């Protein structure tokens, strides 16, 4: 049932008496909405439990009205949006246009790029617009849809990073076993999206749009979590489960997988006779590969740890909202969408070769087929490619030492574990 305005004012005054003075001064707009004639308008359509939930959320900070702060945030988030879209769209374009890059591993890379594009388009702008306008302008339906899209894209990104790590682990640790087929890759990606949807639905369902009269001419809205009773425990354990599924578990799997891969690559011996120059080149490549693996783990851990801990502490009521901290942590987490294309593609020599080939095709007319030189194929494709044609295998063997050709083995030091080409 609806609560009489007199009782609301009485309860509000009781809550104010228990709050610290600075908390009230941080919420001038909300205080105005909850006093006097505005109170009856604000709570006309809400129950007593709605009022309790809303008052509980008043402790979690207010919006900054500083134009300089808003301008800086717009510039900072625009930087992420531009670079993330450019990098991830280009990754998808290069992989789709090049038949040689169509593999299960490439599907995972594309899925990661799609998830990062979703984060860029559906997470960053909603957060920024809500802060700049100090109100929710997207309507009741988008209050639920945006929350679902935000969490779903984050789960897809984390799960895809985990799938890539597991795939690389299988390739390096068991090089003679068949690679994951494209069909299985599609199935794994479908499972990732189903899991992400399942994990994201509670966040989408437990959202509510609160509307209040800010002034005589302005009505503002807030899209807030609205959990069933006991709301505090529900919120706390939901965020705890999200923290484990979205951060701790993927980080553990990625760390273990890449640690084993790095150890395998570092300890493996070169097959056949090699010169000192070749040995030093292979050693440098080992170091570069291990550094890339460490970079993947460190960036994932550093980018997402602050925001996840902040949200978990907030839902546990251990801290109050601090806008400066929130947007610093949020920006840092969102910036991972710019790093992923760089780590998984730009640092990979094969991807750069394919990108240059694609750009050269766009710049000048292509030569007749008989005049083209065959593209170099990495030596490790001989052992791992499922459907190797005779010509490609012969070309690959041309680059291998004679001892390797006779043994049919592959030198693990020549493998790039985060390669997008299979």
From Swiss-Prot:
Q: Which residues point to the Extracellular side?
A: 18-70, 128-143, 206-236, 314-326
| Predominant localisation class | membrane
Keywords for this entry?
Answer: Cell membrane, Disulfide bond, G-protein coupled receptor, Membrane, Receptor, Signal, Transducer, Transmembrane, Transmembrane helix
Q: Does the keyword Metal-binding apply?
A: no
| Expression sites (tissue/organ) | Expressed preferentially in brain, and its neuronal expression is relegated to limbic brain regions, particularly in forebrain.
> Per the record, which residues fall in region Disordered?
401-422
Cited InterPro entries: GPCR_Rhodpsn, GPCR_Rhodpsn_7TM, NPY_rcpt
Q: Which residues lie on this side of the membrane: Cytoplasmic?
A: 92-106, 167-184, 258-292, 348-422
Spell out the molecular function terms from Gene Ontology: G protein-coupled receptor activity; neuropeptide receptor activity; neuropeptide Y receptor activity
Q: What induces it?
A: Increased in the prefrontal cortex of rat chronically treated with amphetamines.
In which compartments does the protein localize? Answer: Cell membrane
What is the membrane topology noted in the UniProt record heading this document?
Answer: Multi-pass membrane protein
Entries under Pfam families matching the protein: 7tm_1
What are the disulphide bonds in this sequence? Answer: 143-223
Transmembrane parts of this sequence: 71-91, 107-127, 144-166, 185-205, 237-257, 293-313, 327-347
Gene Ontology CC terms = cilium; non-motile cilium; plasma membrane
As given in the record, the signal peptide range reads 1-17
What does it do?
Answer: G-protein coupled receptor for PEN, a neuropeptide produced from the precursor protein, proSAAS (encoded by PCSK1N). Acts through a G(i)- and G(q)-alpha-alpha-mediated pathway in response to PEN. Plays a role in food intake and body weight regulation. May contribute to the regulation of anxiety-related behaviors.
Q: Which family does it belong to?
A: Belongs to the G-protein coupled receptor 1 family.
Full protein name: G-protein coupled receptor 83
To which species is this protein native?
Answer: Rattus norvegicus (Rat)
């Amino acid at each position: 049932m609806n609560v009489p305005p007199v009782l609301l004012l009485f309860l509000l005054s009781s809550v104010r008496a228990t709050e610290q003075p600075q908390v009230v001064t941080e919420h001038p707009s909300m205080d105005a909405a909850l006093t006097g004639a505005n109170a009856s308008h604000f709570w006309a359509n809400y129950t007593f439990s709605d009022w309790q939930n809303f008052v509980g959320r008043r402790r979690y900070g207010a919006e900054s009205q500083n134009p300089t702060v808003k301008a800086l945030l717009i510039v900072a988030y625009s930087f992420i949006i531009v670079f993330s879209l450019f990098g991830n769209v280009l990754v998808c374009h290069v992989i789709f246009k090049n038949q040689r890059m169509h593999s299960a591993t490439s599907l995972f890379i594309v899925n990661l790029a799609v998830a990062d594009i979703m984060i860029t388009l559906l997470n960053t702008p909603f957060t920024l617009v809500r802060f700049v306008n100090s109100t929710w302008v997207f309507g009741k339906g988008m209050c639920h849809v945006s929350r679902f899209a935000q969490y779903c894209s984050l789960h897809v990104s984390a799960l895809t990073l985990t799938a890539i790590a597991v795939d690389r682990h299988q390739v390096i640790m068991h090089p003679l076993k068949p690679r994951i087929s494209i069909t299985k890759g599609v199935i794994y990606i479908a499972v990732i999206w189903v899991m992400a949807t399942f994990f994201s639905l509670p966040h989408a369902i437990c959202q509510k749009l609160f509307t209040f009269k800010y002034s005589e001419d302005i009505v503002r809205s807030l899209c807030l979590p609205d959990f069933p009773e006991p709301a505090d425990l529900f919120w706390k354990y939901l965020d705890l489960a999200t923290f484990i599924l979205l951060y701790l578990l993927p980080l553990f799997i990625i760390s273990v997988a890449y640690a084993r891969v790095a150890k395998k690559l570092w300890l493996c011996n070169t097959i056949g006779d090699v010169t000192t120059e070749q040995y030093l080149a292979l050693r440098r490549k080992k170091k570069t590969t291990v550094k890339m693996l460490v970079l993947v783990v460190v960036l994932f851990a550093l980018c997402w740890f602050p925001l996840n801990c902040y949200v978990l502490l907030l839902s546990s009521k251990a801290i109050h909202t601090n806008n400066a901290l929130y947007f610093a942590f949020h920006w840092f987490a969102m910036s991972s969408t710019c790093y992923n294309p760089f780590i998984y593609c730009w640092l990979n020599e094969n991807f750069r070769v394919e990108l240059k080939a694609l750009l050269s095709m766009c710049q000048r007319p292509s030569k007749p087929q008989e005049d083209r030189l065959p593209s170099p194929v990495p030596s490790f494709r001989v052992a791992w490619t499922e459907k190797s044609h005779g010509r490609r295998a012969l070309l690959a063997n041309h680059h291998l030492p004679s001892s390797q050709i006779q043994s049919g083995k592959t030198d693990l030091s020549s493998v790039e574990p985060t390669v997008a080409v299979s």
